[in-house]
Amino acid sequence: RRRLGVDTIDLYQTHRIDPDTPPETTLRALTDAQRRGKIRHAGTSSMWAYQLAEQLRTSEREDLLSYETMQNHYHVAYREEERDMLPLCDAEDIGVLPWGPLGQGFPARPFDDLERTNRGDPENFHNPTPEYERGGGKEINERVAELAADHGVTMAQIALAWQYQNEYVDAPIVGTTSVEHLEEAVEALEIDLSASDVEYLEEPYEPQPVIGHE
């Protein structure tokens, strides 16, 4: 709060969960922070759907603050959250705020260019290429490029437009390194992907191992 220069934080999100800490311990601490006026609302981030369900049951049973947002791993080339987490959030009226909506750049630049960047370096721990490629990612990347050319926009804007129009997503968390990229992200709100565009982007996707929970 001091760094932000505010008395109350509107939305305080926990960074994943500690499996060794009982849900009620964290939720009681957040409830206390809310009652003392330090936070208004609380959310959480990447976990299994059963873990979120346990958190929600604990809140109801113990009359504690309940999570209102989920910050999860979700983008056009990684959609495993559609299995359980997103339907759960929809049923419980929990806002979805995906982190990494551009998949560390995977759907934001031509596939061949990924290998020529630091993020595409096989020695880079955060190299997303092998993870997303095995789920039909290469073809998804190529289709993002095609639609970007058709719409006269960047690949990143198509990837964001897919997020903006997604029925589950409330507000993707977009990280930028320049004002230009921030402006592009805002401009992507004006892109109207047709139903056939969305189907074209989603059709190559194949289920893949869940990543991003640890």
Where is each model-derived feature located?
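Beta/alpha (TIM)-barrel catalytic core signal, keyed to glycine-rich beta->alpha loops juxtaposed to Asp/Glu
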Residues: 21-203
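A short beta-strand-loop micro-motif that forms or neighbors metal/cofactor-
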Residues: 205-208
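Acidic/histidine-enriched, glycine/proline-rich intrinsically disordered or flexible terminal extensions
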Residues: 212-214
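Active-site groove signature of glycoside hydrolases
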Residues: 1-22
